[in-house]
Design a protein with these regions (language model features):
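Acidic, serine/threonine- and proline-rich low-complexity intrinsically disordered segments
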Residues: 1-151, 156-157, 161-172, 176-183
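Long, low-complexity intrinsically disordered regions
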Residues: 176-207
Length: 207
C-alpha cells in the first residue's frame, strides 16, 4: 500500500493497533506499508499471476519479463510502458518515473534521505552524507547505487516520491581558526563558484 493514499486511515490507527500489525510482520515505512515476507520471488510471481487472472487486458509477455527481472533480484529496472502501475505494485515494485523500484529499496532510500534532511547547520552535530541546509539534501553515490540508477532516471524516482530538483550554490564553510583569514576567504569564494544540485521537500517519517 502506498502510504499517502491511506493517510486518513493511518491517522485513525493508534499505536497499540500498529504494534499488533507489526507482530504479524507488517512494515510501516515512509512511502509504503507492506509485508517483507511477500518480497520473496515466489510470492511475488504468484501474486502477479493471480492478479493477471482477474484482469481483462494484461500483456502477459510484458508481465513475464517483469516477473523474470523481479525474480533475478534486481532492485530496480526500466519500466515497461505496456504494464500498469498496479502490475508493478503486485510485484512489490513502485512505478517511479522511468524505472520500477522495489518498495523495500525505496524505504532504504528514505533511511538515507531522512538524516540528511533532519540535520541543521550550526548545531554542532556531525553533518551526514547528503545534508545541505536543513531543508534540502544533495544526491549521494549511496542513494544512486541503492536504486541502480543515476542522472535523469534517478531524478524521476525522486520526483515520483514528491521531491523536486533544484540547483544552488553550496553553503560557505566556516573558516578554520588555524587558517589565515585571507586563505579562508579564498576557499569560500572558490566553493561559491561551484553549483551543487539540491533536492527540496518535506521529509516523510517512517516507523
Amino acid at each position: 500500500l502506498e502510504r499517502p493514499k491511506i493517510a486518513a486511515e493511518m491517522k485513525d490507527l493508534d499505536q497499540p493497533s500498529r504494534a499488533v500489525l507489526r507482530k504479524y510482520g507488517v512494515r510501516f515505512g515512509a512511502y509504503h506499508i507492506f509485508f517483507p515476507a511477500l518480497l520473496k520471488p515466489g510470492a511475488r510471481t504468484l501474486a502477479s499471476l493471480l492478479w493477471a487472472l482477474k484482469q481483462d487486458d494484461v500483456d502477459m509477455n510484458a508481465l513475464g519479463g517483469a516477473q523474470h527481472l523481479a525474480a533475478s533480484g534486481r532492485t530496480s529496472f526500466p519500466a515497461d510502458k505496456a504494464l500498469s502501475q498496479d502490475a508493478y505494485r503486485v510485484l512489490c515494485y513502485k512505478l517511479a518515473g522511468e524505472r520500477s523500484v522495489r518498495v523495500d529499496i525505496l524505504e532504504r532510500l528514505a533511511d538515507l534521505i531522512r538524516p540528511a534532511l533532519s540535520w541543521r547547520p550550526g548545531t554542532g552535530a556531525e553533518k551526514p552524507a547528503g545534508a545541505f541546509d536543513g531543508r534540502s539534501f544533495t544526491v549521494t553515490q549511496a542513494m544512486t547505487s541503492l536504486t541502480g540508477s543515476a542522472g535523469e532516471d534517478f531524478a524521476s524516482v525522486l520526483r515520483s516520491l514528491g521531491y523536486r530538483m533544484d540547483r544552488r550554490a553550496p553553503l560557505p564553510e566556516a573558516p578554520n581558526p588555524a587558517e589565515a583569514p585571507a586563505e579562508a576567504a579564498a576557499e569560500n569564494t572558490t566553493a561559491a563558484e561551484n553549483e551543487a544540485p539540491a533536492v527540496q521537500t518535506e521529509a516523510a517519517a517512517s516507523e
